[in-house]
UniProtKB/Swiss-Prot annotation:
Keywords linked to the UniProt accession: Acetylation, Cell projection, Chromophore, Disulfide bond, G-protein coupled receptor, Glycoprotein, Lipoprotein, Membrane, Metal-binding, Palmitate, Phosphoprotein, Photoreceptor protein, Receptor, Retinal protein, Sensory transduction, Transducer, Transmembrane, Transmembrane helix, Vision, Zinc
Biological source species: Ovis aries
Record-listed N-acetylmethionine modification sites: 1
Subunit structure: Homodimer. May form a complex composed of RHO, GRK1 and RCVRN in a Ca(2+)-dependent manner; RCVRN prevents the interaction between GRK1 and RHO. Interacts with GRK1. Interacts (phosphorylated form) with SAG. Interacts with GNAT1. Interacts with GNAT3. SAG and G-proteins compete for a common binding site. Interacts with PRCD; the interaction promotes PRCD stability. Forms a complex with ASAP1 and ARF4. Forms a complex with ASAP1, RAB11A, Rabin8/RAB3IP, ARF4 and RAB11FIP3; the complex regulates Golgi-to-cilia rhodopsin/RHO transport in photoreceptors.
Protein name: Rhodopsin
Signal peptide segment: none
Amino acid sequence: MNGTEGPNFYVPFSNKTGVVRSPFEAPQYYLAEPWQFSMLAAYMFLLIVLGFPINFLTLYVTVQHKKLRTPLNYILLNLAVADLFMVFGGFTTTLYTSLHGYFVFGPTGCNLEGFFATLGGEIALWSLVVLAIERYVVVCKPMSNFRFGENHAIMGVAFTWVMALACAAPPLVGWSRYIPQGMQCSCGALYFTLKPEINNESFVIYMFVVHFSIPLIVIFFCYGQLVFTVKEAAAQQQESATTQKAEKEVTRMVIIMVIAFLICWLPYAGVAFYIFTHQGSDFGPIFMTIPAFFAKSSSVYNPVIYIMMNKQFRNCMLTTLCCGKNPLGDDEASTTVSKTETSQVAPA
C-alpha cells in the first residue's frame, strides 16, 4: 500500500518515515506546500463569491417576476438550490479547512460536509437529467399531445432529491464512508480501498453506474435527439429564418451543456474510477485534488448555462438589477416561456 490508512481516513502518502498524521488532528503540509493549500482556499473563495450571488439572484428574480414561475423554471430553481447547498454545505467548510491545512472539524464534520456537498452535487446532476428529458419531450414530441406541466415539474424535482439522497445517505449509515480526500481539506465517499467491512466495492460500483454513467447516457441521448430534430425541421423549412435561428441556438446550447458536463464531472469520475480499479498504485494528493475541486465549479457553470442563456430570465434579471428598467429594452423580456413549451424547435 502506497498510502496510510486509518480508522476514518486514507492519506495518499507512505508513513515509512513516520511523518503522516491524522487529517483531523494536524496540518498536512507533507502532502503539499502551504502556498498550495492557500491556493485551494483562494479558489474556494472565488467559487463562493461567484456562486452565491448568481444562484441567490436566480431565486430572488423568480420571486419578483411572476411570469418566471413556470414548470420548466421549477427545475432551474431546484438547480440553484442545489448549487447553494454546495456553496454553504461544502465550499465554506473547505475554505476554512484549506486555510488551516487539515480538516479541523473532525470525523463528524467530515460526514456533514461530505453529505451536503454530495447532496448538492447530485441534486444538480439529476436536475440536468430532468432538464434534458423535459427538452426532449417538449421539442422532439415522442408522446403526442403531451404538455410539460406543474405536476410534472414537481415530480421531476422530487425525483432529483430522491436520487441525490440515494447517493449521499448510504455512507452515513455504513455503506461506504465519508473521508478527507486529496490534500485532506474536503470530504467525499471512500474509493481508495475496497473496505469489505463496509461493502465499499459495491457502493463505488453503484455510484459510478447509477449516479454517473446513467445520467451521462440520458443527457447524450436526449440532446442528441434534440439536435437531430431541430436539423430535420430546418431542412424541411429552408426559407424559415426563425427555424434556422432556432437550430443555431439549440445546437450552441447543447454543445455548451455537454462540454460543461464533461469538463465538470468526467475528470473526477475518471480519476476515482482509475484509483478504485488500480488498488495499491502510486498516486499523489494533487492528482486527486484537482479533479474534485474542478467539479465544484459546476455551481458557477450551471446558472450561466441554464439560466443566463434563457433570454426571458436574463432580461428579468437585468430589470431587477437595474431597478425596474431593462437596458436592452422590453420586447425581448416580454417573450413568454410558454412558447418554449409548445414549440417543436425553440430552445429554453
